[in-house]
Amino acid sequence: MDPIIEQLRGKVIASCQAYMGEPLRHPETMAQMARACELGGAGGIRCQGLSDIAAIKGRTEVPVIGIWKEGHEGVYITPTLRHARACVMAGADIVAIDATDRPRPDGNTLEDTVRPLKEEGVLVMADCSTIEDIRHAFAIGCDIASTTLSHPGAAIDCGMADGPDVALVRQAVEEFPDKPVICEGRVHTPADAKAAMDAGAWAVVVGTAITHPTSITSWFVEAAGK
């Protein structure tokens, strides 16, 4: 097992991302957020955009999982080989890519993207939607599979009561006991994180519940108003 991946075992990975038009959308702000998460015990950081990757890599000592989002529909998480290579150049230790079977914007297959990355020694995290995605990702050489895309819509559109896809984590771990399966998506409480780890997750990614104050505030406002 690669030592960087081994370093993530049993850890919480903080996803530090701000969306277009939000007050926190600035590389230095995200770097400060990432450093704060590291001080709290985060064992890794997931972040979006070349400037954010570079800034966070310069401020933290834990592994950085980089993505480059292009748009908001279809395959938009690191959708092409060009995007993936740019994330590596920006400093990402691991590159996460959409690993669903949807058409990719450059017309290539997922394997067309993963193969050259692996030849170049890049660690690849497959953002999956189904167990079939996970099977395919491991079959073509992806190093990590995650449940990132097993839920519809953006994470910030989920309510606090929406939980992670623990069933998919459990199924993937049962089929691939020696492979790193990471739980990501709708991990909103410490109990959610524990449930994912109890299901066998290699690590758990937590984003909105740690690093998106607008959503966190709205949860309190909604609860207080009832």
Where are these regions (language model features)?
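Glycine-rich phosphate-binding active-site loops on the catalytic face of alpha/beta enzymes
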Residues: Q17-Y19, A90-R104, I144-C158, A199-F220
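Conserved N-terminal beta1-alpha1 strand-loop-helix module at the mouth
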Residues: M1-M89, E132, H136-I140, G225
